[in-house]
């Protein structure tokens, strides 16, 4: 199962203790204090990276701790600092404090770093407490504890293109054609049960970077009310630059293809109104099941009902119309 939400208790390292020690040399029988300070505890750092796509590496982990600082030593030597613990997460990760529900950080770029829990300071050795009036202090202090936080990690995928549609609309087949990969497909609903990422080569030679495309699991009516895990799926649409609605042009027993599009638009607007402003293309899929005249009739029907939308006739199975779709991607995204 695609892992897009986890909760982990994070503990920074404790500072090392300061020590009481005395200078002992042959010709200094009354040597002074010589105890060093403790090392600083390791911090916990969160870093975002484009090569990480989920929280899979943290599956079943409930607790993580950075290294403690070491105690001070004689000869005024400080203890070694604890090593920082760096957790690498995907772009699009949102951090939330479980206790306060405060949003701690939103990672939207590659290489962003956040110190989420700071290590404790090291304790002071007795040398630190030497004064003109107290030349032989016997005091040393313990290290401070590191910060502790219960943190929820939530992933909202960042992709250039998000495929949105009802189960069995042919999204996965189209995804395979666009990304030149082989996602499992089948003639039954909910073949895709978790978001899948792929790369679509850009046709614009001056723009070498491929588009990142996300196949979002099938949306059903009532998704904004969390029917069919709808909220878990809809959240991944928020971070995409372009939405590709995939509609089975032949429709289904339940409703007409025009009604399917209306429901999809309504579901997105009920979830987040600002999704109405996101750039989108409507792919009328499975045209290989229709005769040329029937295709044109269906297209004209959609254009009458949704005059402001951009439609593309295509077949994810045969690849017909996919080149035109790629050109539209370039026009919308290569800016």
UniProtKB/Swiss-Prot annotation:
The keyword Metal-binding applies. Its EC number is 3.6.5.-. GO terms for cellular component: cytoplasm. Signal peptide: none annotated. Pfam families: GTP1_OBG, MMR_HSR1. GO terms for molecular function: GTP binding; GTPase activity; magnesium ion binding. GO terms for biological process: ribosome biogenesis. Residues 1-158 form the Obg domain. Monomer. Belongs to the TRAFAC class OBG-HflX-like GTPase superfamily. OBG GTPase family. An essential GTPase which binds GTP, GDP and possibly (p)ppGpp with moderate affinity, with high nucleotide exchange rates and a fairly low GTP hydrolysis rate. Plays a role in control of the cell cycle, stress response, ribosome biogenesis and in those bacteria that undergo differentiation, in morphogenesis control. This is GTPase Obg.
